[in-house]
Every structure is written in structure tokens, then in C-alpha cells.
Amino acid sequence: MDGAAGPGDGPAREALQSLSQRLRVQEQEMELVKAALAEALRLLRLQVPPSSLQGSGTPAPPGDSLAAPPGLPPTCTPSLVSRGTQTETEVELKSSPGPPGLSNGPPAPQGASEEPSGTQSEGGGSSSSGAGSPGPPGILRPLQPPQRADTPRRNSSSSSSPSERPRQKLSRKAISSANLLVRSGSTESRGGKDPLSSPGGPGSRRSNYNLEGISVKMFLRGRPITMYIPSGIRSLEELPSGPPPETLSLDWVYGYRGRDSRSNLFVLRSGEVVYFIACVVVLYRPGGGPGGPGGGGQRHYRGHTDCVRCLAVHPDGVRVASGQTAGVDKDGKPLQPVVHIWDSETLLKLQEIGLGAFERGVGALAFSAADQGAFLCVVDDSNEHMLSVWDCSRGMKLAEIKSTNDSVLAVGFNPRDSSCIVTSGKSHVHFWNWSGGVGVPGNGTLTRKQGVFGKYKKPKFIPCFVFLPDGDILTGDSEGNILTWGRSPSDSKTPGRGGAKETYGIVAQAHAHEGSIFALCLRRDGTVLSGGGRDRRLVQWGPGLVALQEAEIPEHFGAVRAIAEGLGSELLVGTTKNALLRGDLAQGFSPVIQGHTDELWGLCTHPSQNRFLTCGHDRQLCLWDGESHALAWSIDLKETGLCADFHPSGAVVAVGLNTGRWLVLDTETREIVSDVIDGNEQLSVVRYSPDGLYLAIGSHDNVIYIYSVSSDGAKSSRFGRCMGHSSFITHLDWSKDGNFIMSNSGDYEILYWDVAGGCKQLKNRYESRDREWATYTCVLGFHVYGVWPDGSDGTDINSLCRSHNERVVAVADDFCKVHLFQYPCARAKAPSRMYGGHGSHVTSVRFTHDDSHLVSLGGKDASIFQWRVLGAGGAGPAPATPSRTPSLSPASSLDV
């Protein structure tokens, strides 16, 4: 039939699948309602003596342990079958007085006969209803052999004739309705209170219980998602309700934003290197070791609420100004850009400048030097690129003017005269003079003189400039030239029009690089360093622009973006491929910080070492050492990597690509030992079974491909396919015994699969409620449904990971935040500990093998954060106070 399918069958098949899925959900809901009524009638008709219906005060018969409410049968021996599922298995629940709550019934009376409660699940595996769960509420005893209805699967044909199908369907519904347990009195025993509306678990408009209290339902984009409650949970009120005792502390940030930013690398008086990535300003001391002044490693200023775009260091070498972009909040409302002035020794914010005064973001800023840094000039990213001057000590704006409609890439005060400001950018160099306004907000004036190129070719961009000790200015441009601008006498023709008191003209030109010059740096000995783009050269220039020495940056690090002078002859170089290099012109340079250059999605942690692997849109596959905070190795995948997972042995790693291709690499030799293509759509998840015998690959073609794997993980062969999802696969997890899979899809399905039994879909999802999972990364499921915020559209949570000790759940959301919840998290609006720092959607989170650290990936900011887990189940002592949520307050902007 497949070979004869016409071109129009694809949309028709998709529509049929969608209708089948909707019908299945509606049938389950109707069966629950009908079954409740049918069970009540059956008990009245078959089991209840007439005397028990005389009134509420009539005692129950001797054989009954509980009296029934008026007009209802007693709840002594209700029977239980598949609750709105396809497998009709009837079981009886012996009851006796017990605690109220959500349960499978009270405990059995003493002396009652008990039988094992396990029910056989599809594929031969067993699913225990009570064993292994704390305080099981009752014993489930089969009353009759399990009966399996021959309901045809989606996209499959039935063996029965068309005329018999309606009759069989009605028969199945009647059996299910007659056998479904009604937990009569369960709501009354709780005082009629819905646990989701109780003080311990505030109600939610998107979740509710079904009539029997055996499942929870939530809605995403109006779609109902039913999740069955494990048998060991008698009431949601007994589940954890507060935030976890564990907290996170930012341990290390991998990466440096050099690809698309400037003014991003400086050296402080303490010797620490300061730079930024995402919303974090990093203070790095080469050499490693514990953080803090006088030590090593990293410290972090985390007071910003969106991506940092530029930095400036005060002349005292201690205070730092950092400007951020505007961004939007989780509701899509624009946030206001701002400049923070903060102390690099204490990480305390000293001043917040320009809140509400800038548009879109802060593009460039600089401190004055002639007056000990009393003033700060700022250029924003509005269409007019407003130039403003501020009093640093009081946060007061002294002057403001529209600079130009063209891009402004750099700004700076003349170090000998704070009344002179220079800006450069697209096809311009402007010389500004500002006067007055000191002590009077907004009363100062700014006047402009354009730099005239005259006989010299006007470049497209002038990305950088530097002031020389003699007062001249050097500019680097997109043509690879260094121009020397000298002062000329005052312009007597324009004083009435506010002309500048002096003008600058080009006095010399030197061709320094092939391609654009991105950085100029004045050294302490008076020489100048220039960094080229296309040629990746770093050149030292003496008086008269005579080349003294040069070095070339290796190609895989990219072009020179920024230069800073360290201690002695040491230089720090930032590159366009987000690397930070350290060295000198004679000995060369080596990387101290490295990172990805494009959006990240793939993340997995090593099963026995503190290492993790990342991949993304830059086509690089990187293995990181979490102890040394260094890149162990990287290879070029040639294609976009979207997901990865280590084999349990750690010897190989599987990587899924965006073309339907997946690779298996040896982690020691980096050789590709397997290269397979499944379909032509991107792969969103790869996951080894806990015993390493299988590899599951979730694709955007709605299929989970299963492969048998050799003991060393190097060889694999197709075992089967799990087909039944109506949308692309997003997440999947293996059961602890390695026989079953739980999976989520793009249309919010939760499906279960019997892999060992032939990759069959388990239609009876209720039977999987007590199954234990080796990992928990599915974002939809009873144990984690409390992580979803109100009003979610289904895309708000990108990644989820349960810790190996099963104490906490980490969540990556679309609002740049990492959350920590208690596990299980099965209460609506569950509280969490929230951590900021990423400047883009957080795409993935994973715990290391010993739960000592958590790794999170930023999306478009290409950042990798390594968090230390502190507290009850973490690597260190719990802090005395709860974890702080980053904000603009000084106390919460620290993470030392």
C-alpha cells in the first residue's frame, strides 16, 4: 500500500492521525465519566443489601467495615479495572478505616486474604501497584483473568470486519464502564477540598483531578494532558511543597563574547581580567584556584538583567562600568537598558545610571581620566545614537545630544582634557566638546566637529581609536589603515555656531593589516599594538608607526577582537571566535578561556567523571573538563549538533545532527566509530539505556529509532522503531530495567513503549504509573508537572533533569532562568529557586555524575554555566540564608 500512495496521502494521513488522537483522548474522558456511574449502579444492584440503603443512620452490615453516605453504597469491596484505558483488568480492593487522601483504597482488614498486586504489562514486564512504594494504601487482587480488547492501533488495520467494529467498541466501553472503580466518599473524606486549592498547593486553572482521583490533568494550549498518580501516593498534600534545601552557586562560566561586541576586555589593578558573556561580567585570574582577590579562578558580577554589551574601567583600576541591552521580560514587555557602576573588589553596585534614559541598549561607554574619573560618557543604540555625559558620583546626566544616525562603535575622553570626547563608527570620526552643566542636570552643551578625510580614502568603518601621549589620535579602519590625527589651531570661523575650540586633521597614514583593524592598545612603554581581522596579526608599532614586532593568532581562534596589557610583558587577546588568549609577541599565545560561537543545544555529562560534552549551531563538538575548567578537545562535525549522550561505559558518545544523521565517537581517540542516517529530519534526542544494550534516537519525523549496541558501544544494529507519536519527539527516558521508554512529543503527548517486547506502544498508560525511570528528562509527566508555570504555551520549558539522587529537578526555561525544584514536583505552582545569568533562552541542563554540579547552556548567547550544588544533596554546606534571586539590589547582585 505504501508504494501506491499518492502525493496527497501525506496531508490526509496527518489529518487522520490528528483526528484519531483527538478521538482517543475524548473516549478516555467519556469512559471515566460513564464508568463512575456504571460502577455505582453495579454496586447498588449486585453487592449492597437493601438494609444499607434505609438512611444515613443505618449501621453497615457486619461484613462491611465502612458505612456509606446516604443514598450511596458502602465502600467495603469496590472493584477496580483499567481506568479509561484499553486493557480491561478487573481487581478488587479490600478496605478498612484509614487515612483520607488520594489512594487506591484503605488498607485491607486483618485476616483478609492478600495476593500479589502486580499486574502484567504489555511486553511481559510487570508493573507493581504497591510494592516498593512507601505506605501502599491497599492491596489489589485480581478477580478474573486479564482481558485484552483488540482495539486497533492508530495507523494499523483491524482483523475484525467493518460491521463488527461498532459492536466491539460498544462492548469494550460497557465492560470498562461496568468495572471502573468509583472512589465513593474520597472527596468527602477530605472535606470536599481539592488538594490543588489547599494552602499547601494553590489551585491552578490549568490542572485538575478526574472523578476518581487517580490522575491529574493539565492543559497546554487547550490540549488536555492526563497523568496517572502512582499507587504509593495517597494524597498530593503529603508531597513536598516548598523549594528544595539545595541551592546553586555559579562556579564557572565558559566562553567570552568576542564575536559581536567591542570594549570587552580589560585588566584591573588587582591583575584580574574582566570581560563579559551573557548577563555576567567575569573577573578572571589566570592560574586557577579559589576565587576572590588575591586568589585565582573566577568571580562574577551578576547584577544585570539582560546581556552586557560594553565595559569601561575607572582610572583607579577598581571601579567598573558595564552597560546592558534592553531585552524583554517574560510577558514580552521591553525592559530598560541601564549602566551599572560597581566595585570590583566587593562586587557591590555603587551607582545605577540612565534607567529610562537609553533606548534599545548601551553601545559604548568610557570614563574620563583627566579628573580622576569624575564623568562617564555613554552612547546608546537608538536610531540617533544619543551621546550623554554623566556625573559618576551622583548618577546625574549633565549633557545629551543626538550624535548620528550611523552606527557608533567606540567612544572615549581625551586623557588630558575631559572636555574633549571622540566617537567613531560607520564612515565617521567625530570630535566633541562639552562645557557647563557641572552640578546642574542637563544644562551642559555638546558641540561636534567632523573629522575630514580630505585626500585620504574614507573608510566604511572606523572600529577603534587610541590617544597618544603627545595628544594625537590613532584610528584603525576597515581598510586596514592606521590614520594619525593631529590637532590644529582653533577654528575662528565658527565660534558663533558653536564650533569646537580645536580641530583634528589627518597627518599620516600607514597600511597595517589586510582587512579591518578591530583593536588598538597603547602600552605602558608608549608603543601601540594593533589587531587585524582578516590576517589575524598582532603588530607592535613604535614612533612614526614603525613596525617593531608581530605575531599571528592561529586560525581556529579567529581574528583579534580586543587587546589588553597584563602584568609585565604579558598580553591578553580576545578573539572573534570567543576565545581569550594569554601570552606575548615573542613566545606566542595559548588559550585560557574558550567557548562556542553560536547557539547551543546539545549537552550530556560523563557517567563517571566530572566532564561534559556540548554541541550546537557552530558545528563544534566540545568535551569540557569540569575540574580544570578547560576544553579537553573539540572536533568539527561539519553539521549542526543538536543532542548527545554518553554510553554508560563512557568510552563512546552518540551525537545527533540536524540532518537525520547520527555519529558515535570514541571519547579517547575522537574517531568516528559509527555513522548512521535515520530519515532526513533533525534528531532532537539520543539516549542510551542504563545497561548500554540499546540506543534510542528521537527524530522530528515522529519516530523513535531503537538500536542494539555492542558491549563497548562501538557497534550498533537496528532493533526496531517506536511509531505512534503524532508530532516530533522532544524528550525520552529509559526505565531502570532498560525495557521501557517514556517519551514526549511536540504536541504534548506522553507515550510509553515496550522496547524489549518489540517496540510496542503501551496503550494502557495507567499501568506505567509505578514504573521507575533511570533518568527523568521528559518535561511532561506526573512527577514534574508542577514545574510548569501558569499560562504556559507549552514551549516555556526547554529542558529538565532530575538529579541522580532523585532529590531535585533542574529546569531550563525560555526566560533565561535556571530553576531548582524538589522531586517529585507534583503540585501546581510549585515554588522553586530561580537563578539568572543567561542572556538567552536556556536550552539544556544536566547534573554531573555525582550531583556536585549542574551545567546549563545558553541558547543564542553561546554561554556555558557550571553551577555548584550546595545543601542537603550537593557538594558543599548549605548557605545560612536561602539562595538569592538576582535583581538590581546590591545584596542580590553578588555571587562571590
UniProtKB/Swiss-Prot annotation:
PANTHER family linked: ECHINODERM MICROTUBULE-ASSOCIATED PROTEIN-LIKE 3, WD-40 REPEAT PROTEIN
Compositional bias of kind Polar residues: 77-88, 174-189
Organism (species): Homo sapiens
Stretches the record annotates as Disordered: 50-209, 876-896
GO-annotated cellular components: cytoplasm; microtubule cytoskeleton; midbody; mitotic spindle microtubule; nucleus; spindle; spindle microtubule
Subcellular location: Cytoplasm, Cytoskeleton; Cytoplasm; Nucleus; Midbody
Family: Belongs to the WD repeat EMAP family.
Organism taxonomic ancestry: Eukaryota, Metazoa, Chordata, Craniata, Vertebrata
Annotated GO MF terms: microtubule binding
Gene designation per UniProt: EML3
Pfam families named in the record: Beta-prop_EML, Beta-prop_EML_2, HELP
Binding partners and assembly: Homotrimer; self-association is mediated by the N-terminal coiled coil. Interacts with EML2 but not with EML1. Interacts (phosphorylated at Thr-881) with TUBG1, HAUS1, HAUS2, HAUS3, HAUS4, HAUS5, HAUS6, HAUS7 and HAUS8.
Residues carrying Phosphothreonine: 881
Entry coiled-coil feature ranges: 16-43
Role description: Regulates mitotic spindle assembly, microtubule (MT)-kinetochore attachment and chromosome separation via recruitment of HAUS augmin-like complex and TUBG1 to the existing MTs and promoting MT-based MT nucleation. Required for proper alignnment of chromosomes during metaphase.
Modified residues (N-acetylmethionine): 1
Annotated protein name in UniProt: Echinoderm microtubule-associated protein-like 3
Annotated Low complexity bias: 154-163, 877-896
Effect the entry attributes to changing residue 881 to A: Loss of phosphorylation and impaired interaction with TUBG1, HAUS2, HAUS3, HAUS4, HAUS5, HAUS6, HAUS7 and HAUS8
